[in-house]
């Protein structure tokens, strides 16, 4: 009798341990690689939240192919750490893919590690040309690019801002300033090309380190060149610094057009003051004050964000990462498995039409594994809020101009 009890107990123990082992096998691990400390932490963390919300949503619906998605975080505080964290996630954690990363410089560094290891890397926020311009087999980008941002900046000037000011855009003088990493350099280069192709006059194109603590000489140079339109591609600190020092110097261009980054963040408006930022334009990812008929699912995303994090989203970076991650998860669920080539095949077959995602655009990967359907929008700060003013089908407000 005692022996039979022991045998039953042993059998039960084996069954239980087998169940636990099977449950462990039912998890699929992905890396979440963003700058979550250091100077880019605010936007990095905001971006990571979008991925986390997409994971919550897919797990609530049964996971991917019946397997629960588990995220392992990595901190891409600088380029060296981004590389080291990519190695750790791949070699020690055993992730099936990496998602990230917001910073162009960080993803350019980290994706070289994943490419050599044959592990897919999904970039959902960095815009620089070089991200997808290196011909990597395992890197895919879901978000719009520096070229999209630059084109929208110039188009918005020609089609909306100049007419609203009663000006011929060819009579306006443009100053282009930018933080000098891959992000700012790419956007500024395309802005100059687009402006010149449209017959516009660029009087200054000047870069600076994003950690600069004084932009007064650049403000002076813009004024001396007679720039009445300033296009700035920047992170938060340098966005705040430029707006404050331009104001202190009494430099008031007819229009300022931000290139995402700090110009899309509510904390930037709060830091400089709503009166100072009022009227400033911005070309960037889809934001939240937008015509929701063009962005199905956006309202539900905002509600999920508030429920998880206890506040409104701080910028459109979370939304862009959420949309990208959801698209990849959809592809993987329709795919054959989680081996690298299976993931690549599944993602290449993805075909989401325009107007079916919360950011308003679709997803289909084309040349260099870039999402060829990704687009940006034009916004303006009005009464302390960033509202969509361009294109017309997504706008909820008309452009305002100071008399």
Swiss-Prot record:
<dbReference type="InterPro" id="IPR000709">
    <property type="entry name" value="Leu_Ile_Val-bd"/>
</dbReference>
<dbReference type="InterPro" id="IPR028082">
    <property type="entry name" value="Peripla_BP_I"/>
</dbReference>
<keyword id="KW-0732">Signal</keyword>
<dbReference type="GO" id="GO:0006865">
    <property type="term" value="P:amino acid transport"/>
</dbReference>
<keyword id="KW-0029">Amino-acid transport</keyword>
<comment type="similarity">
    <text>Belongs to the leucine-binding protein family.</text>
</comment>
<keyword id="KW-0813">Transport</keyword>
<dbReference type="InterPro" id="IPR028081">
    <property type="entry name" value="Leu-bd"/>
</dbReference>
<feature type="signal peptide">
    <location>
        <begin position="1"/>
        <end position="26"/>
    </location>
</feature>
<protein>
    <recommendedName>
        <fullName>Leu/Ile/Val-binding protein homolog 8</fullName>
    </recommendedName>
</protein>
<dbReference type="Pfam" id="PF13458">
    <property type="entry name" value="Peripla_BP_6"/>
</dbReference>
<dbReference type="InterPro" id="IPR051010">
    <property type="entry name" value="BCAA_transport"/>
</dbReference>
<comment type="function">
    <text>Component of an amino-acid transport system.</text>
</comment>
